[in-house]
């Protein structure tokens, strides 16, 4: 039997974590460990992964086979497959690959010619031991106040009001996240963590590696975030997750754990739940056809504010309910 190689053509944290259900399924299909090829910066996501034989960067993979005839190699010596191919590109029939309209866990599987069942959609991360030496209390909340596209960024004012609420109620709060630059088709987004006042807790943004971030989330009573890479990482932990509302339909990103989307998870929607980023009727409105992705970053109803965002009142009421009922 030939060795199997899966090459993952994405770099962002969340999109890459969404590959792990496909990797796990291929492992069980072949009943052996799989070779995986990823960008160098993504290797951290697969540390300790028990389904991987050898983990290669693109450069390491090319170096390994540089003296081989490629066509002979993939026809006779190895099985080679790629996932996350050609976002926004039309296929031979003219149909655009619209990743905004597909669960990313299924994108990776679909590229290999199959679909994952609901009970196969959970993601994996296998961290190193917790190395952080910071003394943390037993009970704490983690928040991820990162910037993103405007329709996926809760305002600085809202985050500050949330921090004020948590501080007033003596809830130790840890800020996490990382400054990154994400490049997608026609969109470049700088993601960074704002600074806040009146924090009863610690700001650990840009201070933790991925394994330590996993442990930070796994040991937290509660994690609060919008749709983000850390949402997918949190989906590999046992923490309680509050996902804040945005223009993206949560059904494309909410974690599967324990066979359900509802395990230790609440989505707090805003007044508007049209989810225009993923709603294909806006493709018709913008382009006159469903065969294009609508603009991704703004409000496609042209409202003066993002009504899809959670209200601070709904968020604080939810936290109060969870704590008063000993759910977290």
Residue positions per predicted region:
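Catalytic machinery of carbohydrate-active enzymes
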Residues: 1-328
């Amino acid at each position: 039997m030939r060795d199997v190689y899966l090459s993952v053509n994405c770099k962002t944290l969340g999109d890459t974590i969404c590959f792990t259900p496909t990797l796990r399924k291929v492992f069980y299909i072949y009943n052996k460990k799989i070779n995986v090829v990823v960008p160098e910066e993504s290797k951290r996501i697969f540390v300790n992964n028990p389904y991987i034989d050898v983990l290669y960067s693109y450069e390491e993979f090319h170096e390994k086979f540089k003296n081989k005839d490629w066509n002979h190699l993939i026809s006779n010596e190895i099985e080679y497959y790629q996932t996350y191919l050609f976002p926004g590109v039309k296929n031979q029939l003219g149909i655009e690959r619209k990743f905004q309209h597909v669960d990313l866990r299924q994108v990776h599987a679909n590229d290999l010619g199959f679909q994952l069942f609901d009970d196969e959609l959970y993601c994996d991360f296998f961290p190193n031991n917790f190395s952080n030496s910071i003394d943390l209390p037993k009970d704490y909340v983690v928040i991820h106040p990162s910037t993103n596209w405007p329709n996926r960024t809760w305002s600085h004012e809202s985050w500050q009001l949330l921090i004020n609420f948590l501080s007033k109620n003596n809830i130790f709060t840890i800020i996490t996240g990382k400054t990154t630059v994400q490049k997608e088709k026609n969109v470049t987004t700088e993601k960074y963590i704002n600074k806040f006042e009146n924090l009863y807790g610690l700001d650990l943004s840009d201070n933790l590696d991925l394994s330590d971030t996993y442990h930070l989330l796994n040991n937290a009573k509660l994690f609060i975030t919008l749709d983000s890479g850390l949402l997918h990482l949190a989906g590999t932990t046992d923490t309680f997750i509050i996902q804040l509302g945005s223009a993206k339909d949560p059904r494309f990103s909410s974690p599967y754990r324990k066979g359900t989307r509802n395990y230790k998870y609440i989505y707090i929607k805003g007044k508007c739940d049209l989810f225009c980023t993923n709603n294909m009727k806006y493709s018709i409105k913008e382009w006159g056809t469903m065969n294009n992705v609508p603009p991704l970053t703004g409000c496609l109803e042209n409202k003066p504010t993002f009504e899809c965002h959670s209200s601070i009142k709904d968020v604080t009421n939810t936290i109060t309910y969870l704590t008063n009922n000993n759910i977290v």
